[in-house]
Amino acid sequence: MLMLLLLLYTAHLDLALLQIASAQPVTEPEAAMVWPQPQKQVLGTTSGYLATKDKFAFVAANPAAAASAPLHQAMIRYRAIIFQREPEAMTWIGRCDPDERQLRWPCPPPPVVPSRTLVLQTLNITIGSPDETLSLSTSENYTLSVVFPSASLFADTVYGAMRGLESFAQLVQPDHSIRSQQIVDFPRFPFRATMVDTSRHWLPVPLLKAHLDAMSYNKMNVLHMHISDMPSFPFVSTSLPQLSAQGAFDSNHVYSPAIIAELIAYAKARGIRVIAEFDVPSHTYPSWDPIGVRGGNSTLLANCSEYPFGFLRVDLESTYDFLGTLLADVSKAFPDSIYNIGGDEMNDACWNQSAEVASFMKTQGFNGSDLTGYFARRLFDIVRTRSALYHVSSSRHSQLLSLSLFCVTLIGH
């Protein structure tokens, strides 16, 4: 019975695929939708086709555009995306077999491309400013006008031009048809991020680059690297090499300053910033224990074995010296103005269980919240010396600090 059902399912699937293969392609270009939805998209009444690969051109239309290396890189990328294959060579089923050797149906004939009476020859790109700084205030605005025979793209910066190129690529349909229209667009939010947890799951560089590509297709602009946590410490600190030597999964599962610089350059070429998170004061054991000692003999971690997240010895001046040294290396590797300090899942019971920390709290007249605030202020002072804005992952810090705190992400980020 199982075999019969499988055969019936296979026959049904074959029939469905054959029906798709024999369907006639749409000759009148539909209105392609852009993702994310633009602020304004006005469709025209005419439709035409992109010129062939050897004739279509992106044109840097003003001196700022002509001098922009990131823009020229983006034009090369999007030309490759648009012209992955010529329409005449396309098949509507990727798994058909031209020689009929493996599957039971041949490839359908290539789609018939109508006479190209309206042909888009160029996309002229103009950028208003040569400034290539990428920050929270960077403009990503653009205006895209598709009018035959030449389209135009105007942007304040090269990063706005990148967003416009992405929209243009989405407008081109598989048969290279495109409809006249105008798009006026700007991001609703200046900070549009995804987070990758490279402590729990070390990710190879090619995979991170593929993730950055996917972000650029969705016009996202911040990669948040949760780079350290309990499972591993993959960041190679030049001043504290023992951290990754002892804390990484192995010597191959690390991110050296050279690797990070490569990722940041790859991201910036796509209009994406990279910010780092080193989660403190919890989520530090065992990866932050460079000598493999926990408890009373540790000069870095508190003795609270019942609380597996691990906590720093916030009572010791040496802890802040250690953090200052580490953050100096972090700021060199990650030049962005925003740095995430974690701060989630803190538990007062851990510090109360540590004899040394409990003694410090008693001497200072601190309760758990007071100690949290003390640590936060000390850490924020260190971060400020690096000319960085701080970003935390717990609402608890926001209860202890002034409203000048840059941003607070609620627990559960």
Named regions from a protein language model:
Residues 1-3, 274:
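Positively charged n-region of N-terminal signal peptides that target proteins for export
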Residues 4-12, 17-190, 390-401, 405, ...:
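Acidic, contiguous N-terminal accessory segments
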Residues 62, 219-220, 278, 345, ...:
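Generic short alpha-helical hydrophobic face used as a protein-protein interaction/packing hotspot
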Residues 303, 308-399:
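Active-site neighborhood of glycoside hydrolase catalytic domains
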